[in-house]
Amino acid sequence: MPLALLALAIGAFGIGTTEFVIMGLLPEVATEYGVTIPTAGHLVSGYALGVVIGAPIMTILGTRVSRKRMLMLLMGLFIAGNVLSALAPTFGLMLTGRVVASLAHGAFFGIGSVVAAGLVAPHKRAGAIAMMFTGLTLANVVGVPLGTYVGQTTGWRATFLLVAGLGVVGLAGVAKLVPEQPRTKGVRLRHEVAAFRNVQVLLAMGMTVLGFGGVFAAITYITPMMTKTAGFADSSVTWLLVLLGLGMVGGNLIGGRYADRHLMPMLYVSLGALAVVLALFTLTAHDKIAAAVTITLIGGLGFATVPPLQKRVLDQASGAPTLASAVNIGAFNLGNALAAWLGGLVIGAGFGYTAPNWVGAALAASALLLAVVSHTLERRGGVRDSEAAATDTAGTAPSLVRPV
């Protein structure tokens, strides 16, 4: 494994921790600031929207510097945002800190995906992307449970200071292990934007929004759901998050392994099963053992979609993939924001803490429908397939997916 992939995974670990740890600390944050749980949920949706906005903007700005330098600048921004969150005296300032940190998220994973894919042979690209995202999934096994435990025992502010420390480690890893590379020449912004004329790119991003939104509809409010519905103690949430993280690690690795050879079948299975499991979660959430098993499955099925969705975007926009890759990361978080908002609506309407699971099931089923439409169009020749898209785009711009 190239050491540069390890550096990217380290950065992903820090980013993944700050993205997900807030879900285990919503009650503590809500209590300190005197806001409701749905209002505290804006810390999730605000972060997600920051990723959506920041992904294209930061990526475009990053075309002026080398990829390594841009990755380092993004980690610096991430550190600053988490320090602001940790020290924020008001809810508004904490939300601002979350947004500042989130601006680095999409561009880091977008640029990182292109770098990771270029480090290996073409038939191993999904595996390389999955290796980088392993840092994100491991954050849910180690970083998020540890951060939740620290937040519940010593205060949530300490958690965000620790996350800032993770950012420092990630910055050092990128500086040390990612090789210096010149700024890519010959690919202009119009070539990057042209990728969005490919309907398959847009369909893949739609799958990303809806599929990952299904996951977040359930897990955004996992703490009140498990404590008030399943009857778990507050301290048990840490271990439930470990199970969620283990599922994510397994799903990510499986998705990366099979996406290179069976991309669309992988999406069919993972999205279809995710919709079913989320619907069942409305029932299993009332039993501790069944809830724990279901949470693990949601993590696994949700993250099994990440490598194939990211690879599909890279394939369809292979001549100029940097912006499309980053925007697709934003699409993951647009799904997060949509799910957190819809989940808060159904909870606020009095349908209970299990109601977001129905929202998640509907979103995942909609993503499956888009996958069917995408594959059908591709087989009928109504839209360019991956190879044709690569040839067409490469005719106007040299490929960015190459060894660094």
List the predicted regions and their residue ranges.
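A late C-terminal transmembrane helix in Major Facilitator Superfamily
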Residues: 316-353, 360
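Helix-breaking motifs and short loop linkers at transmembrane-helix boundaries and internal kinks
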Residues: 34, 66, 87-93, 231, ...
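Paired small-residue
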Residues: 6, 77-84, 92-101, 289-297
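C-terminal membrane-cytosol helix-exit motif in multi-pass small-molecule transporters
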Residues: 164-184, 370-375
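C-terminal transmembrane helical hairpin of 12-TM major facilitator-type secondary transporters
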Residues: 265-309
